[in-house]
């Protein structure tokens, strides 16, 4: 029991450090929040004049779940970059010589990334009444659970990549080749069913597709069966995200152990 308490404290300390770093970086907070808001009201506002409402859902409402997905994607994966920074500045060595398991380090980093993502999701949800989207208490709870699962899995994915990177530049290049395609091929901006066949097949293999679709099942349930509605049943979205979480959690832990 004492050992478990020690590891839990280590997870808390690592997470708390990352959260304090995030709160101090005002430019990072502004940058990560500005991106989805600009896409929502600038791109969404412009496209809503070209795309007719379907099933009572307009284009801005349609992309709102995708903007939540974008917020989670960028916040979670780029939270994992702290491993690269810690390695470059020697702090990672200090953590690794401490009497804590590698598993606790990974969980601490993943919990921090998830917490940062969820804070930003909560801020983004302020726009729900403005957009005319109505959610009840159960939908709000399901939204938090779905967002938390997606955030944890994507942070673990970022840790999986960053644990093998020795420099910030290398991580940034690889992530840009992964993050942007993941976002654009997730159904966040346009329905997967309307994509060209080749891109549609890639989208089916993209775990973010099911994360975004799960959010659509919660927020846009009234548009089910239309092009603006969710693509898959909610149980399929949940199963894929849960599987992705399990796989990335295991692989990120193994990768960090080997690289550390």
Annotate each PLM feature.
Residues 1-35:
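Aromatic- and glycine-rich beta-strand/loop motifs that create alpha-glucan
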Residues 2-16, 188-226, 234-235:
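Short hydrophobic, aromatic-rich alpha-helical segments embedded in or entering the lipid bilayer
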Residues 14, 32-33, 63, 67, ...:
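Residue-level recognition of transmembrane alpha-helices
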Residues 36-43, 59-131, 158, 177, ...:
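Hydrophobic alpha-helical transmembrane segments of multi-pass membrane transport proteins
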Residues 43-52, 74, 128-136, 163-167, ...:
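Short helix-capping/hinge motifs at transmembrane helix termini and TM-loop junctions
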Residues 45-50, 162-209, 213:
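Transmembrane helix segments
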Residues 102, 106-177, 230-253:
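Alpha-helical transmembrane segments and their short interhelical loops
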Residues 254-260:
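Short cytosolic juxtamembrane segments of multi-pass membrane proteins
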